[in-house]
Amino acid sequence: MLMPKRVKYRKSQRGRMKGNSGRGTSVSFGSFGLKAMEPAWITSRQIEAARVAMNRYMKRDGKIWIRIFPDKPVSKKAAETRMGSGKGSPEFWVAVVKPGRIMFEAEGVSREVATEAFRLAAQKLPIKTKFIVRPDYEG
């Protein structure tokens, strides 16, 4: 599971996801990418499930890059706890993903294999996604 080794502050505010992604919007490492079309919090468990699904389908051929990292702690109060008495303890980590962000990239496999691998990965994610091919890809 992905999470920061150490953070300056244990708890963070929720924030809001306005607009499109300002960075990480182009395929830069591999030949194929999976682009987010909606804003969402992607948990470290969802990222890991998508990674495992891709690796299983690609049979460890090629290379996968994970372009998002869960660096935001989400706190939660215990069940049946009364309101007040402070903020809950950090429960899990999320990556804030805005529309246009490339979340995963792949290299070293055919276009058909990459398409299917990303389709399987997209089923593990709570947002609409789009398969992207690098503009200068020769295949």
From Swiss-Prot:
Keyword rRNA-binding: yes
UniProt xrefs under SUPFAM superfamilies: Ribosomal protein L16p/L10e (SSF54686)
Keywords noted in UniProt: Ribonucleoprotein, Ribosomal protein, RNA-binding, rRNA-binding, tRNA-binding
Keyword Ribonucleoprotein: yes
Feature: compositional bias, Basic residues: 1-17
Record GO biological process: translation
PROSITE patterns recorded: RIBOSOMAL_L16_1, RIBOSOMAL_L16_2
GO MF annotation: an example: rRNA binding
InterPro entries documented for this protein: Ribosomal_uL16 (IPR047873), Ribosomal_uL16_bact-type (IPR000114), Ribosomal_uL16_CS (IPR020798), Ribosomal_uL16_dom (IPR016180), Ribosomal_uL16_sf (IPR036920)
Stretch list, region Disordered: 1-24
GO cellular component: cytosolic large ribosomal subunit
Role of this protein: Binds 23S rRNA and is also seen to make contacts with the A and possibly P site tRNAs.
PANTHER family: 50S/60S RIBOSOMAL PROTEIN L16, LARGE RIBOSOMAL SUBUNIT PROTEIN UL16M
Subunit structure comment from the entry: Part of the 50S ribosomal subunit.
Family from the record: Belongs to the universal ribosomal protein uL16 family.
Protein name: Large ribosomal subunit protein uL16
Gene: rplP
